[in-house]
């Protein structure tokens, strides 16, 4: 499958073959859901915690005598049934991350890239190494395409490209080693460099 390769001036400078095993995979929303949930679970801090009876401060004295009061026996005012007492079965500090099969993760990436390609929201750029710092130049480039947000993925980017995109809220730069399903789906248009296409073919095949 041949697609055009463009430069930062939005000019066609050649063509590149995209492997259909990566860029023309059947749409699988179930796989995308699994991978996105896996990614988001790894981002959670898991710092939530409530106090157990060992954490609650307060007296250790028995509230009242064991017998002959007509009330239920109690041994501590820090028990869960009292106001200001402990919380039973409350959240504890833990990690929410879990493992996901590598084949599923790779398939999710293929499905996400294929989805963008099928919607004509995938562009191939020759390079993102520029020798200037001009936000206006990048702005002119993205205005040629009717998309809301852009994810630019490259092997690496220099300071010129980084500072040119820094003030654009709808443009995100990402190194190819960090290519992931969540970022691809949350941006309207994905721009890959030629080096990134080769990297993804080596990584996913």
Swiss-Prot record:
Could you provide one GO biological process annotation from this protein's UniProt record? translation
**In the UniProt record, does the keyword rRNA-binding occur?**
yes
* GO CC, any one term: ribosome
Task: Establish whether keyword Acetylation is in the entry.
Answer: no
Q: What InterPro entries has UniProt attached to this entry?
A: Ribosomal_uL4 (IPR002136), Ribosomal_uL4-like (IPR013005), Ribosomal_uL4_dom_sf (IPR023574)
Spans annotated as Disordered? 56-76
Q: Name one Pfam family in it.
A: Ribosomal_L4
Q: Which domain of life is it from?
A: Bacteria
Q: Which UniProt keywords apply?
A: Ribonucleoprotein, Ribosomal protein, RNA-binding, rRNA-binding
User: MF terms per GO, please?
Assistant: rRNA binding; structural constituent of ribosome
Give the protein's biological function: One of the primary rRNA binding proteins, this protein initially binds near the 5'-end of the 23S rRNA. It is important during the early stages of 50S assembly. It makes multiple contacts with different domains of the 23S rRNA in the assembled 50S subunit and ribosome.
Q: Which family does it belong to?
A: Belongs to the universal ribosomal protein uL4 family.
HAMAP family named in the record:
Ribosomal_uL4_B (MF_01328_B)
**PANTHER family reported in the protein's UniProt record:** 50S RIBOSOMAL PROTEIN L4, LARGE RIBOSOMAL SUBUNIT PROTEIN UL4M
Description of how the protein assembles with itself and partners: Part of the 50S ribosomal subunit.
- Put simply, this protein is called Large ribosomal subunit protein uL4
């Amino acid at each position: 499958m041949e697609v055009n390769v463009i430069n930062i001036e939005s000019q066609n400078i050649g063509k590149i073959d995209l492997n259909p095993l990566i860029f023309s995979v059947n749409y699988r929303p179930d796989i995308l859901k699994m991978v996105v949930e896996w990614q988001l679970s790894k981002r959670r801090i898991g710092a939530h915690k409530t106090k157990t009876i060992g954490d609650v401060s307060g007296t250790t004295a028995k509230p009242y005598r064991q017998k002959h009061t007509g009330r239920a026996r109690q041994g501590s005012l820090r028990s869960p049934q009292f106001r200001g007492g402990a919380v039973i079965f409350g959240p504890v500090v833990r990690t929410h991350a879990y493992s996901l099969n590598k084949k599923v993760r790779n398939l999710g990436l293929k499905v996400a890239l294929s989805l963008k390609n099928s919607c004509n929201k995938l562009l191939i750029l020759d390079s993102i190494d520029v020798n200037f710092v001009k936000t206006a130049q990048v702005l002119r480039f993205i205005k040629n395409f009717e998309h809301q947000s852009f994810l630019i993925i490259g092997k690496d980017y220099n300071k010129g490209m980084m500072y040119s995109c820094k003030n654009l809220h709808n443009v995100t730069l990402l190194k190819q080693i960090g290519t992931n399903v969540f970022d691809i789906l949350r941006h309207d248009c994905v721009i890959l460099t030629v080096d990134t296409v080769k990297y993804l073919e080596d990584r996913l095949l």
